[in-house]
A protein has these predicted regions:
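Solvent-exposed loop/turn segments at secondary-structure junctions
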Residues: 70-73, 108-114, 138-143, 174-178, ...
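Catalytic His-Asp segment of secreted/periplasmic serine-dependent ester chemistry enzymes
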Residues: 175-267
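Serine-esterase "nucleophile elbow" of acetyl-processing enzymes
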Residues: 34-106, 121-128
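Sec/Tat signal peptide C-region and signal peptidase I cleavage site
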Residues: 27-30
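Bacterial N-terminal signal peptides
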Residues: 13-24
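Internal alpha/beta domain cores that form substrate/cofactor-binding pockets in large enzymes
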Residues: 63-65, 99-127, 139-168
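Bacterial N-terminal signal peptides that target proteins for export
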Residues: 2-15
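Active-site segments of SGNH/GDSL-like serine hydrolases
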Residues: 135-139, 157-189
Length: 267
């Protein structure tokens, strides 16, 4: 790889590590009342989460563990409560008031899938979660992890989590035209789709959802100034958190036969 190519890859790696993909909002007025709903067409099928559904229906505690990288850690928002797992907890708690919901954020910035997998036993399975949301693929794409190695790591991780009794949802990468121009995320996204399809594991299509938001003018892919970084990040994470809550809610309601709803705007 040329010196220019190496420089670009390192630069994009730093951008991705920030966890917001150079997203900013086109206008403050629109941002305050943003509608970041997700069309039903983004759900190929209702996620099947029988254990989570049963816990909600019986008003039992629902323990969720989120494991991932910088965009799950949410440091750019300035507070763990503003990261998408924190916003997910708030959204689910407001919807299922009779079933206590907790979301434990076990993210570490810039980790590959293999590095995350090495933490599963002690940091995820040890917590005996009802549901695990595994966000991965970004750092592997940046570092150029071999696809077969990536596939085997994801498969082994799913097997271990399921063997522990936890349900699993995978989350793919973020969308940004800036990073997509240099880093090939498509190959890793394809692997995630293949593995989740083969294992009948729900995949939260964050990449496609964020691209939909960008193409419809909700988010403008321009660089945010340092003074607005926390604000931009917190708004994005709130949208992601509520979209994941919609995803889980669809699975829970599908198990009861009730129609699924979409949160759309702020709760």
């Amino acid at each position: 790889m040329s010196k220019v190519g190496k420089f670009l890859r390192r630069t994009i790696g730093l951008i991705v590590a920030i966890g917001i993909g150079l997203l900013s909002l086109p206008g403050s007025a629109r941002a305050q009342g943003q509608d970041c709903s997700v069309p039903a067409s983004f759900y190929d099928a209702e996620p099947t989460l029988p254990k989570t559904t049963a816990a909600i229906a019986s008003r039992q505690p629902v323990s969720i563990v989120a494991i991932g990288g910088a965009s799950t850690l949410g440091r750019a928002a300035g507070s763990p409560d503003l990261a998408w797992p924190g916003r997910l907890a708030a959204a689910l708690s407001s919807r299922f008031t009779a079933a206590p919901v907790t979301v434990d954020n076990r993210a570490v910035a810039r980790q590959t899938a293999q590095e995350m997998a090495s933490r599963l036993d002690r940091e995820v399975i040890a917590l005996k979660p009802t549901l695990v949301i595994w966000e991965t693929g970004t750092t592997d794409a940046v570092q150029g992890t071999e696809l077969d190695e990536f596939r085997q790591t994801i498969q082994a991780g799913i097997d271990r989590l399921r063997a522990s009794g936890a349900e699993v949802v995978l989350m793919d990468m973020q969308f940004s035209r800036h990073t997509h121009a240099v880093i090939n995320f498509d190959r890793y996204g394809s692997v995630l789709r293949e593995v989740t399809d083969a294992n009948e594991v729900p995949l939260f299509r964050r990449y496609d959802i964020m691209r939909h938001w960008a193409e419809n003018g909700l988010f403008d892919l321009t660089t945010a100034g340092r003074d607005k970084l926390h604000l931009v990040a917190s708004r994005l994470y709130d949208c992601i958190g509520r979209a994941v809550a919609d995803f889980i809610t669809r699975g829970a309601l599908a198990g009861t036969g009730a129609p699924a709803a979409n949160s759309g705007s702020h709760q």
